[in-house]
From Swiss-Prot:
<dbReference type="GO" id="GO:0006298">
    <property type="term" value="P:mismatch repair"/>
</dbReference>
<dbReference type="GO" id="GO:0005524">
    <property type="term" value="F:ATP binding"/>
</dbReference>
<dbReference type="GO" id="GO:0032300">
    <property type="term" value="C:mismatch repair complex"/>
</dbReference>
<keyword id="KW-0234">DNA repair</keyword>
<dbReference type="GO" id="GO:0030983">
    <property type="term" value="F:mismatched DNA binding"/>
</dbReference>
<dbReference type="InterPro" id="IPR014721">
    <property type="entry name" value="Ribsml_uS5_D2-typ_fold_subgr"/>
</dbReference>
<dbReference type="GO" id="GO:0016887">
    <property type="term" value="F:ATP hydrolysis activity"/>
</dbReference>
<dbReference type="InterPro" id="IPR020568">
    <property type="entry name" value="Ribosomal_Su5_D2-typ_SF"/>
</dbReference>
<dbReference type="InterPro" id="IPR042121">
    <property type="entry name" value="MutL_C_regsub"/>
</dbReference>
<dbReference type="Pfam" id="PF01119">
    <property type="entry name" value="DNA_mis_repair"/>
</dbReference>
<protein>
    <recommendedName>
        <fullName>DNA mismatch repair protein MutL</fullName>
    </recommendedName>
</protein>
<comment type="function">
    <text>This protein is involved in the repair of mismatches in DNA. It is required for dam-dependent methyl-directed DNA mismatch repair. May act as a 'molecular matchmaker', a protein that promotes the formation of a stable complex between two or more DNA-binding proteins in an ATP-dependent manner without itself being part of a final effector complex.</text>
</comment>
<dbReference type="InterPro" id="IPR036890">
    <property type="entry name" value="HATPase_C_sf"/>
</dbReference>
<dbReference type="InterPro" id="IPR013507">
    <property type="entry name" value="DNA_mismatch_S5_2-like"/>
</dbReference>
<dbReference type="Pfam" id="PF08676">
    <property type="entry name" value="MutL_C"/>
</dbReference>
<dbReference type="GO" id="GO:0140664">
    <property type="term" value="F:ATP-dependent DNA damage sensor activity"/>
</dbReference>
<comment type="similarity">
    <text>Belongs to the DNA mismatch repair MutL/HexB family.</text>
</comment>
Length: 578
């Protein structure tokens, strides 16, 4: 049996570094936070090759005295705290003394710094944490940290990184968030020699938020509410119906520290309940300021999560304030939506089914039911083979629509409950499959601008040709933004920007091992299919069921979800002990 023994110092260093430095973004985050702790008013960030080639962070902060420079690379050396109790009164980002130690352990690092009152600065050079040189240099006041060859001594770490473009995108998004959180500090970001982002540093948070979300200032509401001694809520929110189909542009901060918080996410979702169209997430930039004794910031290696002492109070106060602000906002853009998931025909006081329409018998050929314009009509005269006996005959009777989600059908002594969205998805998918090209494009009169996360930005560039082949012409329009000039001719016309963003993210995140075109076909059918919550006429329900029974695979949607739940008369009789 192996003996217990101490790990070599080199291994300990690399393990510790891995907890703090996961990727180039981690390096930039730690260095920028150090600059802010040093009271910097100007912070410039330069990256090459997504940060793997070089990262430079320069600031005009208070600097590091030359006699302290070697100590800066030692583990658990810090100027931020002196005792454990100081953790409850933190006014800085750093406190563990691990950031520079961890970065230096997996890179080649240079730290140049000059404090006020000194004629010159000093430069410390280290490789893999070992000091190589300390020399006097000429430089402006402040600190410049240069990190080169990141992970040069841990090559396995590089294998888990995304493309350089994705890494650069994560850094850009971080800088944008910090510029909003610290509007009085001027931030600049340079990627491969090109200036990508800069803020003015003039305490103008509203404009920075509008730019970050791609919205007009009039669609935003700024917040600053005092809820108690040392307890504030600050930031900004987007007024409904503005929203995104994802949470990537939601930002939370606690005591000036960017964090992820399930409690704050839940509070925001509940505050926006019924005010946003189904499928959209709120746009929020929320900073919670609380006394240090209310929160534990030492629960995550990268300080990305915090723990509130009284989570219920935080949840209730945040939800109430945001909800009241939204409801009372005097904006013409604020109107209430009833999400489809909450729309139902069930009474609050009576637990019984209530159907929207009652049936006439359908024998497969009744012209009078088709007088209204039919959203499920099939003019292509396509012939489908059937794969189930019950679907071979078109004799059935639609009973009605339940909860604006399901169609209730009687067929051959069976009760069928049909998912209207999944059924229409199957119909459209097979219809598109038979078309020579279901993705004929149409040129938009006014191009649509969309915001792209770093991951989506890389995905769009890698699949430019694939998107052209499915009728989407998307081109770059500045950092993190794209213009959509052409869309497929059958693409939904309402709320194009949000539907398109959702469509793109879903294609990107699909893990199914099928072709790009196949993924696009399935999602295209999904986006065009009738939704839960849509009221259907008797004619529309009848034709939807008829066309479903004509498909090759009527029992499931293209993604594999069932379309039909079947109850036999025998099963129903048993429930009534007959």
């Amino acid at each position: 049996m192996p003996k217990i023994k101490r790990l070599p110092d080199e291994v300990i260093k690399k393990i510790a570094a891995g907890e703090v430095v996961e990727r180039p973004y981690s390096v930039v985050k730690e260095l920028v936070e150090n600059s802010l702790d040093a009271k910097a008013q100007n912070i410039n960030v330069y990256i090459e090759e997504g940060g793997l080639g070089k990262i430079v962070v320069e600031d005009d902060g208070i600097g590091i005295p030359p006699e302290e420079l070697p100590d800066a690379l030692l583990r658990h050396t810090t100027s931020k705290i002196a005792s454990f109790d100081d953790l409850y009164y933190l006014e800085s980002f750093g406190f563990r003394g691990e950031a520079l130690y961890s970065i230096a352990a997996v890179s080649k690092i240079s730290i140049k710094s000059r404090v006020r009152g000194e004629n010159n600065g000093y430069e410390l050079i280290a490789h893999a944490g070992e000091v190589i040189n300390l020399t006097e240099v000429g430089m402006a006041y402040g600190t410049v940290v240069t990190v080169s060859d990141l992970f040069f001594n841990t090559p396995a770490r590089k294998k888990f990184l995304k493309s350089g473009q994705t890494e650069a995108g994560l850094i850009r998004q971080f800088i944008e968030k910090m510029a909003i959180l610290y509007p009085g500090v001027k931030f600049s970001l340079f990627i491969d020699g090109k200036k990508i982002y800069s803020s003015a540093g003039i305490q103008e948070q509203l404009g920075l938020l509008a730019r970050f979300w791609g919205l007009e200032k009039g669609n935003l509401l700024m917040l600053e509410e005092k809820l108690g001694e040392g307890f504030f809520i600050k930031g900004g929110i987007a007024l409904p119906p503005a929203g995104k189909p994802h949470r990537k542009l939601q930002v939370f901060a606690v005591n000036k520290r960017l964090v992820k918080s399930g409690i704050l996410t839940k509070a925001i979702d509940d505050a926006y309940e019924s005010l946003l169209p189904t499928g959209l997430k709120p746009l929020v930039f929320l900073e919670v300021v609380v006394p240090g004794t209310w929160v534990d910031v030492n629960v995550h290696p990268q300080k990305l999560e915090v723990k509130f002492m009284d989570e219920q109070k935080i949840y209730l106060d945040v939800r109430t304030i945001i909800r009241n602000k939204l409801v009372n906002a005097k904006s013409s853009s604020l109107k209430s939506f009833s999400p489809a998931r909450e729309t139902n025909t069930k009474s609050e006081d009576n637990d019984y089914w209530q159907v929207t329409y009652f049936a006439e018998e359908f024998s497969g050929n009744s012209d009078k039911l088709l007088e209204k314009e039919d959203i499920f009509s099939t003019s292509d005269n396509l012939t489908f083979s059937l794969n189930k006996d019950f679907a071979k005959e078109l004799n059935f009777q639609v009973i009605g629509q339940f909860s604006l989600k399901y169609i209730i059908v009687e067929k051959n002594d069976k009760l069928l409950i049909i998912d209207q969205h999944a059924a229409h998805e199957r119909i459209l998918y097979e219809k598109y499959q038979t078309k020579l090209n279901p993705f004929y494009s149409q040129v938009l009169t006014f191009p649509v601008r969309i915001k792209a996360s770093p991951e989506l930005e890389a995905f769009l560039q890698e699949n430019y040709q694939n998107f052209l082949e499915i009728g989407l012409h998307i081109e770059p329009f500045g950092p993190g933004e794209y213009l959509v000039r052409e869309i497929p001719e059958d693409f939904p016309q309402n709320n194009i920007a949000n539907v398109l963003e959702e469509y793109l993210y879903e294609i990107m995140e699909q893990k199914e091992q099928v072709s790009f075109r196949e993924k696009a076909l399935k999602l295209f059918a999904c986006k065009n299919a009738v939704k839960f919550g849509e009221k259907l006429t008797y004619s529309e329900m009848t034709n939807l069921v008829k066309e479903l029974f004509k498909t090759n695979y009527p029992l499931s949607c293209p993604h594999g979800r069932p379309t039909i739940y079947e109850l036999s008369l025998t099963e129903i009789n048993k429930k009534f002990f007959r």
